Amino acid sequence: MKFIVKLFPEIMMKSKPVRMRFTKMLETNIRNVLKKVDESAKVKREWDKIMVLVPSDRPDLVEAFADRLSCIPGIAHVLQVNESTFESVDDIYQQTLALYKEQLVGKTFCVRVKRVGNHDFKSIEVERYVGGGLNQFTEATGVKLKNPDMTINLEIDRENLYLVVNRIQGLGGYPMATQEDVLSLISGGFDSGVSSYQFIKRGSRTHYCFFNLGGDQHEIGVKQVAYHLWQKYGESHKVKFISVPFDPVVTEILEKIDNGQMGVILKRMMMRTAARLADKMGIQALVTGEAMGQVSSQTLTNLNVIDRCTEQLILRPLIAMDKQDIINLSRKIGTEDFSKSIPEYCGVISQKPTVKAVLSKIEAEEQKFSDDLIERVLETAEIIDIREIATSMDTKITETETVGDVNSNEVIIDVRAPEEEEKDPLKLEGIEIKTIPFFKLATQFADLDKAKTYLLYCDRGVMSKLQALYLQEQGYENVKVYRP
């Protein structure tokens, strides 16, 4: 079994040197991701595609490889194929008949052929020969060239024949790290998760900067969003997660700043702090989830005033998107349920926020801040490799809270996403196992029997630890992490 990875069309339009660089980077990214699934993964780059070989003795890897390939930026689509050689057009037909005969029963179909190399036949001749044979010797209802029930795709590459078993839609975009790094201001809400995803998809290593206004509980929720985005779409490269305790800034805003100017000034202080961090990390741009007119601080006038606080480039990929479209995209990329469970933390609430801030007035208000305010905030910022989120959770979860054995009064809760749980369900004889996805646990945990202890389980132990800490922050003491 092989996968043929087709490049995103915009890559194909690049000059030869750029196309080569992008393709090499995509090959490396695919290898980095698939090696985490299985060390035996083999990836081979060609001029217009990348081949991924699945070991013949490991058919169990096919689904896992397909799932990972569908989430790697830079891929238009992936063809799962059976590879063979052929001697003639009739041989191609016989192989196609053997594979598709049962699938064609009661269906209309067409045959599409792509061909590379010198042959004594044309692609359309193969389509007609194979299609005619299938129409005559199967129980298909007939050939239909437009909108058939089934399209049979064949690829002929010199002496090799590829029978397409499955076509997997890719993520599109550019390969990770072909564009410059960005620092995304992430709050855990719908907007910041989607804006981060869009830059991952466009090929930028996306680092995360979180301004903590809601304590540990807020930070745990945001880390789940960032970790999910990285693990699913950007796992090929290391990125940083920065947590900035912003309480000192909020305190001074509430004590010193005119009520109507608070929202704009809070955003300016965030941008200044993020710009300093970006400079330190050699990052060229900040990314936010702001959309024009969504809240009072996001009018064009206010956004212009916010931008004036730094020379750093500020990018807003959602600027003209409707809220419902943003939520729909968050659902597609898997962050919607995270964002739903994170409360809205608003550090400063103006009674009558300005929608037309005046730069001179804003700057005059900012003169009231302590001179060393941003320096003090930066000194307390925590910068970690996003892969260390699990390790940082370990320092907060004691050994007694992580268990490998299950007692009679304990119940295991499988917190994996439904599709992951269905692929490999957890089974333990004599043990009660509940399946509650991580994104529903916060709302459903209160309904469980409080007399029992619950052990949270996931494959890698990251989401289970984050959820355990989240519940402990809410005051639940009957929760632990299960690591068999």
Swiss-Prot record:
The molecule here is called tRNA sulfurtransferase
Annotated pathway: Cofactor biosynthesis; thiamine diphosphate biosynthesis
Source lineage:
Bacteria, Pseudomonadati, Pseudomonadota, Gammaproteobacteria, Alteromonadales
- Catalytic reaction(s) noted: [ThiI sulfur-carrier protein]-S-sulfanyl-L-cysteine + a uridine in tRNA + 2 reduced [2Fe-2S]-[ferredoxin] + ATP + H(+) = [ThiI sulfur-carrier protein]-L-cysteine + a 4-thiouridine in tRNA + 2 oxidized [2Fe-2S]-[ferredoxin] + AMP + diphosphate; [ThiS sulfur-carrier protein]-C-terminal Gly-Gly-AMP + S-sulfanyl-L-cysteinyl-[cysteine desulfurase] + AH2 = [ThiS sulfur-carrier protein]-C-terminal-Gly-aminoethanethioate + L-cysteinyl-[cysteine desulfurase] + A + AMP + 2 H(+)
Tell me the SMART domains matching this sequence.
THUMP
Q: Where is the active site?
A: C458
Q: Which Pfam families match?
A: Rhodanese (PF00581), ThiI (PF02568), ThiI_fer (PF22025), THUMP (PF02926)
- PANTHER family according to UniProt: TRNA SULFURTRANSFERASE
What keywords are assigned to this protein? ATP-binding, Cytoplasm, Disulfide bond, Nucleotide-binding, Redox-active center, RNA-binding, Thiamine biosynthesis, Transferase, tRNA-binding
Designated gene of the protein = thiI
